[in-house]
C-alpha cells in the first residue's frame, strides 16, 4: 500500500448543527397540559369568580400587561391569586388559552368582549384579528356601531376603515336605524366630510331632516348646528326654495333662515361667488373608485391553475377572488363593459376555445359566453371599439394567424382579416384606433415584427419592428406609448424592455426590469405600469415590479399569492362594495 498522507493541520472537530422545528410546538403543548392538570401553576387569575390557573412566566412572555404586573412592584406580583375586574371572563379564558396554544377563534358572539380584553392585556395580534373580523362584517346597517366601538377602544385602523365605508356607502347608511340613533357630534363628523359619496347635496339635507324628526323634541335645538354642514349653496334652486325654505322647522329658526339666505345669495349673485367661497360652497369629492388589477390563471408548480387574485394598489394587498371553472394557462384576458373575460388557454391536457366572464360586483364567473371558432392558447386578447378581439395563438396543431372578434350584444364571434404572420405568444395593444400584434413566435423562432389592424379597412399592415425578438412578452399602452417588456428570444428569458412611438413609428429602449420575465403580464393601474409574474429561466415568479417613467427605473412592489407563468392580467374599476375597499 502507498504511504498515507497526513496533514500538518490539526483536524477540525466534528460538528452537526440542528434546530428543531417541533420543539417549540411540543413545549407549548406540554406547558398547556401542565396548566390543564394544574401542575407547577404559580398564579390563579380570578375574573368574576371564574378561576383560571396559569404560569406567570407564560403570561408574562405573551402579555406586556401581565409582565408589568408580575415583574414590577405591584401588590399582584406577590399574590398567588389575582383578581381582574372590568373584563369578560370568557374572553379572558380565550386569551389565556391563546397564550398556551397560539390558537383562537374569533366570531360574532365573542368579538365584542374579546377586543377590549385584548386591548387590556396588550395582545396586539388578537386586537388585529378582532379588527380584521369586524372589517369583514361591515355593512350599511352596522358600520356606525362598529365605528363607535372602534373609537371607544382606540382601534385607529378599524375606525379609518369604518369611516371610509360610511362615507362610501352613505346613501344606504342614512336609511339605517343606527343613523337615526347617532349623537349629534357623530352626525356632524360624518356629514362635514368632503369624501361623502352622494349623488347630490339634497341627499345630505334629507338625511339630516330624517335624523332630526326621529326625535324632534330633543334635537331641534341642534338643527342650526347640523345644517351649517349641509352645503346649501350647492342645492338646486327649486329644492332650496321649495323644500328647504318651506320647511317649518327651518323657517322657525333664525340661524337656519340665515343659512338659506346665504345659499340664495350664492345662487342669485353669480358675480359675487368668488367672494363667497367657503366650506359650504366646496363640492364634495365622491369616493373615487380606483383601479384594481386581476391576475388570472397561468402555470404554477407544473400545472395549469384556475386561481384568480386581485391587487389593490392603495393597500398593496393581493386578495384571492372566485376561481375560474377551468384551469387555464396561456389564457387571454381583457375587460369589456366592466366585465373580465378569460379567453381560451390550455388546461394542462387540452387546448381550449371556451370563455369565462367575471363580474366583480358578484364575485362570480359565468360560462355563457360563446366559444371562439378555434381553440387557442398563448393568444392575444384586447378590446377595440366595443368588440373583444382574439389574435393568433396555437391550437395544438399549428401556430395561428387567425383573428376573430366578439360582439357582446349578439354573443357571437366572427372572423376578421388574418394577420400576415402566424403568431403564438403574441402581445396585443390598442392605440389610436388600431390593434397592434407585437412579437410572438411563428412556430419556428421568436419574432420582432409588429403589425397593426385597421378595423375601418379590415386590413393588417406592418410597422417598425422591435429591436429584440420576443415571444411570450408583456405589452401595455402607457402615456401614449406601447411598452413591450420581457419575453424570450432565441436562447434565454429577457429582462429588457422597449417602447413604441406611433408618431415616429420607432422603438426605443427603456431600462431593463429587475428580473428576467417570460410569460409576464403587463398592465397600467391608476397611472402606473406593473409587470406581473412570469418565468426567469429557473423559477416561476410571483414578484411584481412597477416602472417609473420619470426616473426610468423599475422597483419591486410585493408578491402575488401564486407564482404565475402565462397568466393573464386585466384592470377594472373597483366595485362599489365593501369587499373591495381594503
Swiss-Prot record:
Pfam name, any one: BACK
SUPFAM superfamilies according to UniProt: Kelch motif, POZ domain
A molecular function GO annotation: ubiquitin-like ligase-substrate adaptor activity
Pathway(s) of this molecule: Protein modification; protein ubiquitination
GO biological process: negative regulation of synaptic assembly at neuromuscular junction; proteasome-mediated ubiquitin-dependent protein catabolic process; protein ubiquitination
Renumbered residue ranges of the record's region Disordered: 1-21
Record keywords, A-Z: Actin-binding, Kelch repeat, Repeat, Ubl conjugation pathway
GO cellular component term of the entry, any: cytoplasm
Keyword Membrane: no
Ranges for domain BTB: 41-108
PROSITE patterns: BTB
Kelch repeats by residue range: 292-338, 340-386, 387-433, 435-480, 482-527, 528-574
InterPro entries on file: BACK, BTB-kelch_protein, BTB/POZ_dom, Kelch-typ_b-propeller, Kelch_1, SKP1/BTB/POZ_sf
Residue intervals of the BACK domain: 143-245
PANTHER family per the UniProt record, alphabetical: KELCH PROTEIN (PTHR24412), KELCH-LIKE PROTEIN 20 (PTHR24412:SF451)
The protein's role, per its UniProt record: Probable substrate-specific adapter of an E3 ubiquitin-protein ligase complex which mediates the ubiquitination and subsequent proteasomal degradation of target proteins. May have a role in synapse differentiation and growth.
Protein name: Kelch-like protein diablo
Organism of origin: Anopheles gambiae (African malaria mosquito)
Lineage, broadest ranks: Eukaryota, Metazoa, Ecdysozoa, Arthropoda, Hexapoda
Gene from which this protein is expressed: dbo
Amino acid at each position: 500500500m502507498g504511504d498515507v498522507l497526513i496533514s500538518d493541520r490539526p483536524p477540525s472537530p466534528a460538528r452537526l448543527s440542528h434546530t428543531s422545528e417541533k420543539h417549540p410546538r411540543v413545549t407549548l403543548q406540554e406547558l398547556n397540559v401542565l396548566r390543564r392538570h394544574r401542575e407547577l401553576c404559580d398564579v390563579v387569575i380570578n375574573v368574576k369568580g371564574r378561576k383560571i390557573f396559569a404560569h406567570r412566566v407564560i403570561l408574562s412572555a405573551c402579555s406586556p400587561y401581565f409582565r408589568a404586573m408580575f415583574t414590577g412592584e405591584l401588590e399582584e406580583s406577590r399574590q398567588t391569586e389575582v383578581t381582574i375586574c372590568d373584563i369578560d371572563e370568557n374572553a379572558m379564558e380565550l386569551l389565556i388559552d391563546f397564550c398556551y396554544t397560539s390558537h383562537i377563534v374569533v366570531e360574532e358572539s365573542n368579538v365584542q368582549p374579546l377586543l377590549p380584553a385584548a386591548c387590556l392585556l396588550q395582545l396586539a395580534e388578537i386586537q388585529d384579528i378582532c379588527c380584521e373580523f369586524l372589517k369583514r362584517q361591515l355593512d350599511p346597517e352596522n358600520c356606525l356601531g362598529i365605528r363607535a366601538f372602534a373609537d371607544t377602544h382606540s382601534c385607529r385602523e378599524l375606525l379609518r376603515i369604518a369611516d371610509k365605508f360610511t362615507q362610501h356607502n352613505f346613501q344606504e347608511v342614512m336609511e339605517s336605524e343606527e343613523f337615526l340613533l347617532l349623537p349629534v357630534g357623530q352626525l356632524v363628523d360624518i356629514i362635514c366630510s368632503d369624501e361623502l359619496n352622494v349623488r347630490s347635496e339634497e341627499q345630505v339635507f334629507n338625511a339630516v331632516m330624517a335624523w332630526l324628526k326621529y326625535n324632534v323634541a330633543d334635537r331641534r335645538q341642534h338643527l342650526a348646528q347640523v345644517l351649517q354642514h349641509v352645503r346649501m349653496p350647492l342645492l338646486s334652486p327649486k329644492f332650496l326654495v321649495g323644500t328647504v325654505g318651506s320647511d317649518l322647522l327651518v323657517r322657525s329658526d333664525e340661524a337656519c333662515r340665515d343659512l338659506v339666505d346665504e345659499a340664495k345669495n350664492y345662487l342669485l349673485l353669480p358675480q359675487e361667488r368668488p367672494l363667497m367661497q367657503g366650506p359650504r360652497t366646496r363640492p364634495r369629492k365622491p369616493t373615487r373608485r380606483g383601479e384594481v388589477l386581476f391576475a388570472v390563471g397561468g402555470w404554477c408548480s407544473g400545472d395549469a391553475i384556475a386561481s384568480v387574485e386581485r391587487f389593490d394598489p392603495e393597500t398593496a394587498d393581493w386578495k384571492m377572488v372566485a376561481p375560474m371553472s377551468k384551469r387555464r394557462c396561456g389564457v387571454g384576458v381583457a375587460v369589456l363593459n366592466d366585465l373580465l373575460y378569460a379567453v381560451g388557454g390550455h388546461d394542462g391536457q387540452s387546448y381550449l376555445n371556451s370563455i369565462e366572464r367575471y363580474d366583480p360586483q358578484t364575485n362570480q364567473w359565468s360560462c355563457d359566453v360563446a366559444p371562439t371558432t378555434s381553440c387557442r392558447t398563448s393568444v392575444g386578447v384586447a378590446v377595440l371599439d366595443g368588440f373583444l378581439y382574439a389574435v393568433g395563438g396555437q391550437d395544438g396543431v399549428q401556430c395561428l394567424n387567425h383573428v376573430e372578434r366578439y360582439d357582446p350584444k349578439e354573443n357571437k364571434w366572427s372572423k376578421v382579416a388574418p394577420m400576415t404572420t402566424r403568431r403564438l405568444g403574441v402581445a396585443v395593444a390598442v392605440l389610436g384606433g388600431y390593434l397592434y400584434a407585437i412579437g410572438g413566435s411563428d412556430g419556428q423562432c421568436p419574432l420582432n415584427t409588429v403589425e397593426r389592424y385597421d378595423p375601418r379597412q379590415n386590413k393588417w399592415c406592418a410597422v417598425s419592428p422591435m429591436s429584440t425578438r420576443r415571444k411570450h412578452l408583456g405589452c401595455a399602452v402607457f402615456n401614449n406609448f406601447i411598452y413591450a417588456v420581457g419575453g424570450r428570444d432565441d436562447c434565454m428569458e429577457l429582462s429588457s424592455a422597449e417602447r413604441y412611438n406611433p408618431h415616429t413609428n420607432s422603438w426605443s429602449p427603456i431600462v431593463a426590469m429587475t428580473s428576467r420575465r417570460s410569460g409576464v403580464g403587463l398592465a397600467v393601474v391608476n397611472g402606473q405600469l406593473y409587470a406581473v409574474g412570469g418565468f426567469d429561466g429557473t423559477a416561476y415568479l410571483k414578484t411584481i415590479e412597477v416602472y417609473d417613467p420619470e426616473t426610468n427605473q423599475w422597483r419591486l412592489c410585493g408578491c402575488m399569492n401564486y407564482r404565475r407563468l402565462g397568466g393573464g392580467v386585466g384592470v377594472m374599476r373597483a366595485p362599489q362594495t365593501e369587499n373591495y375597499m381594503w
